[in-house]
Amino acid sequence: MRPAAFLDRDGVVNVDFGYVRHVRDWQWMHGARAGIGWLKAQGYWVIVVTNQSAIARGLATEPQVLALHDWVLAHTRVDAIYHCRHLPHDPCPARKPQPGMLQVAGQDFAIDWGRSFLLGDRDTDIEAAQNANIPGLLSAGDDWRGLVRDYVSRRTS
């Protein structure tokens, strides 16, 4: 079993320009790839969990989102990306703040929940962490590596 670092996508892994549908629209958050590499070196699963209502809104197709996620997986050490396609008011157990995406990841990976956390940039991310009974770290939308390193070092000391 290994701990998981669950990362929100838009605003944590990439710059949140609204609905990012294509690789040409993608811009990495400063330090995100290095932060992902550091987490992997510490023995974490790195798992992205993201609400993608652009699909339900008709602004992106599921194949577009999956192709973008395949590109991210090919260019980082991220282990998996889970997304929810539903609108905020839809009753979906996967859409954050519900913990469904994290729970599915727990079925797919041997996760040490006692050492896992979720890093996000919105209250719904922190609520999803709370609903999954793990700590939530709120990123200020900039380079989050220091925040995560401090958190991990406090947990291991």
Locate each region found by the language model:
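Gly/Ser/Thr-rich helix-start
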Residues: 12, 59, 121
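Anionic group-transfer/hydrolysis microenvironments
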Residues: 10, 53, 98
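Asp-based, Mg2+/Mn2+-dependent phosphohydrolase catalytic module
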Residues: 3, 63-80, 89-118, 122-157
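Active-site neighborhood of HAD-like aspartate-dependent phosphohydrolases
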Residues: 1-47
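Substrate-recognition element of Asp-dependent hydrolases with the DxDx(T/V) motif
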Residues: 32, 36-69, 78-87, 129
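Flexible, glycine- and charge-enriched loops at secondary-structure boundaries
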Residues: 22-29, 58-62, 95
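A short alpha-helix capping/helix-coil boundary motif
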Residues: 12-16, 48-51, 80-82, 103-106
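Conserved protein kinase catalytic core
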Residues: 14-16, 57, 127
